[in-house]
Amino acid sequence: KDKMPNTAGSLAMKDSFPLHDAFLVEKLRKSGAIIIGKTNLSEWANFRGMMSVSGWSGNGGLTKNPYDLTRNTCGSSAGSGAAISANLGIFAIGTETNGSIICPSSVNGIVGLKPTVGLVSRSGIIPISVSQDTAGPMTRTVKDAAIALGVLTGVDEKDAHTLASKNIAKTDYTSFLKLDGLKGKRIGYSKKSSGNVKVDFLFQENLKFLEKEGAILVEISEEPVSNEIQGKSFDLMILEYKDGLNNYFKSLGPNAKIKSVEELIVFNKNNPEEMKYFKQEFLEMTQATKGMQDENYAKLLKEIQEGSRKNGIDATLKKYKLDALIAASTSPAWKTDMVNGDNYIFEGSGAAAIAGYPSITVPMGNIDGLPVGILFYAEAWSEGKLINMAYTFEQKNPQRLVPQ
């Protein structure tokens, strides 16, 4: 499939055709990938309104979970998760600011790999946060994720963050597909309850498996990224969102139907079909800011990055001499509720997402027929190590239940 519109699921962008392929799409084509289509997503990557329904967009309607059509797919890469789980393709590209690869991969029973920010170019992708956004592969196996990731990496002059990956990024991650990823590895975990007793029990059972495979489990007493930093990351995203969207609209040329966040807000107000389930508080919040020109932006960015990196994940890994950290990826899929919105219980993806560090989720079991993933995450540029751990876990403890 070629020459498709790029819509973020919005009716405002229904006939919006980019002037160029995204950098990662160019990479895929050059590698011989056959692009068969685009999937639905949570509109505006689940960053339009407070009562949003994951997997719903004005343009595409509601994405349904292949394990139970009344259950949610999570998001924002909702269609990517459902399509790969349902065997409609070998892999899909998801994007994540916080949870949008990991959560839909977990609840749809597949593998999701969120790379370090800067390993994969974002140019051509509709943005939320320049400091957190990334694209990554969503697949049924760790092997497929490793193959796909190697195709996606590369320095792109249109995305300055990719310069940091020079001489670090690999074009082949399959060398990490070995069965020695757990033995002798020090892996940190928290005993703090997820809020779901069945998830806690399943996680504990998988801890026993990790120990059996020779991993050294280390209980950590604090969260790698504090609640304060996690809260402030939302404020940062709101500031970055305005600049990101306005710059994207500008890239579409002078004939673009929507040219600014302000015009997008007006379109939504004038089109009740867009607003029938939830509103657009996040768009209105970002429009009310000065964006990245806000006088507190640089200070806030530094505080969040230091708090999540040097004084967060890096400090935790160093303090406990860890190779990686693990958590349950998220709760099982909830019943879709078009009135009250999403019913998250918890997500394990926040720390790595805010830091811009890599993480990978792999199926660890099922609760009442609904899949749940386990999340491995570590320092920047540690994709190879995480693939090695996840591959060993997957191959020696296969837990993927095929949807019927």
Language-model regions, residue ranges each:
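Gly/Ser-rich, acidic/histidine-flanked active-site/gating loops
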Residues: 1, 5, 132-134, 161-255
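Solvent-exposed loop/turn segments at secondary-structure junctions
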Residues: 1-2, 18, 34-35, 41-44, ...
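Short, well-ordered alpha-helical
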Residues: 1-17, 42-46, 162-174, 178, ...
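Short helix-loop capping/hinge segments that flank enzyme active sites or metal/cofactor-binding pockets
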Residues: 1-11, 176-190, 238-309, 361-371
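Gly/Ser-rich catalytic/binding loops embedded in alpha/beta enzyme cores
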Residues: 1-98, 116, 140, 184, ...
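Solvent-exposed, polar/charged alpha-helical surfaces in well-ordered, non-transmembrane soluble domains
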Residues: 22, 26, 30, 65, ...
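Glycine-rich, small-residue loops and helix-cap segments
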Residues: 30, 34, 89, 284-404
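Structural helix-boundary/capping segments
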Residues: 30, 34, 85-191, 204-209, ...
